[in-house]
Amino acid sequence: MNPQAFICDAIRTPIGRYGGTLSGIRTDDLAALPIKALMARNPGVNWELVEDIIYGCANQAGEDNRNVARMAGLLAGLPVAVPGTTMNRLCGSGMDAVGTAARAIKAGEAALMIAGGVESMSRAPFVMPKADSAFSRSNAVYDTTIGWRFINKLMKQQYGVDSMPETADNVAAEFRIARTDQDAFALRSQQRWGAAHAAGRFKDEIAPVEIAQKKGDPKIFDTDEHPRPDTTLEQLAKLKGINGPELTVTAGNASGVNDGACALLIASAAAAKTHGLTPKARGVAMATAGVAPRIMGFGPAPAVKKLLAQTGLTLAQMDVIELNEAFAAQGLAVTRDLGLADDDARINPNGGAIAIGHPLGMSGARLVTTAMYQLHRTGGRYALCTMCIGVGQGIAMIIERV
């Protein structure tokens, strides 16, 4: 019988706003924080036996450029014998890291893994390419925070290089997602986060971060700072379309540009017993799919269908559905295609990325983490986690409470 992969612990930083509380922390230092928290919460683990660290990171042009997973392990104080590798499936990187770690354990090639993701969009650098020829006076500078750079002309000709908000407007147009429905979706995200925060539902998954001050004691940062739980429909309706006044995607019904890191401790049953760990969830399976880049936000729909077919499970069996809210338009296009109601209580019951934020390489790991704790709070069995990915992909993963 093949071994199973169990999530034994999962923890994340609070998510910071662009230029906010976490913006003063180097990306590699940020990546180390949840690993340090895992080490502190699990003192019985022999950390020398961790087979690998797999981290997702979408940028990798700045302080995250030299294999940030390896950097994170060293900076966290793990033994030098513990290796690390960084994955890049853009927005899906963190989820891909978790699924890949689980696959290694299921294959019998590893017994104890750390997986997660990091992104500091605040600290994403500007980059400049070399000139095509000597003494050329041409130059270009790209902001690597999000979106296209170093554009391939053939890619542009064949598929277009629409910005992320443009792809969301493409989805809204193609699937006829009304502005009012997008704003209502965004409002639910904010309100559900507000209720979850008030009930203390994020305490188990968030590791407070100490922020050094110029004078006095460090500031303790322990709450996501992107949410706006007092948002109203009237306020959302006043916002202008990002891509033009006649279009429907706005700053209010889109996810944020954010900073954060997340790490999960994943083990086989035997390793969990050896290290005194209590399995919390089983990694059931993961699947990916491709769609046209111009409607990249629709990617979760085929990924979810592929995953359900692969596992023999149904949407009706899912007790929690964590759908990354890159944009309300794409979220609604996906849920409607899957036959789900817009206000299905299983979808992002504690709010989603429109409220919480979307640090690209971290978000997938955050979805799995949040889903796991929600299953334990409610006694549910299965959770489906899924997200869209730039350049036209989707990823989905199912976990089971144990």
Please report, for each region that a protein language model flagged, where it lies by residue:
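Conserved active-site "lid/cap" helical segment
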Residues: M1-A72, A76, T167-R179, S189, ...
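Condensing-enzyme catalytic core mediating Claisen C-C bond formation in acyl metabolism
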Residues: M1-T27, I146, T232-F298, P302, ...
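N-terminal extracellular/periplasmic Venus flytrap/periplasmic-binding protein-like
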Residues: R12-T13, G24, D28-L33, G44, ...
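Conserved catalytic cysteine-centered active-site region
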Residues: I25, C57-L112, T145-W148, Q158-M164, ...
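Active-site pocket-lining segment
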Residues: Y55, D169, F202-E205, Q213, ...
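Active-site-proximal alpha-helical scaffold in enzymes
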Residues: M87-E119, A172-R201, A263-A270, T335-R336, ...
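Flexible glycine-/small-residue-enriched beta->alpha junction loops
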Residues: L112-N170
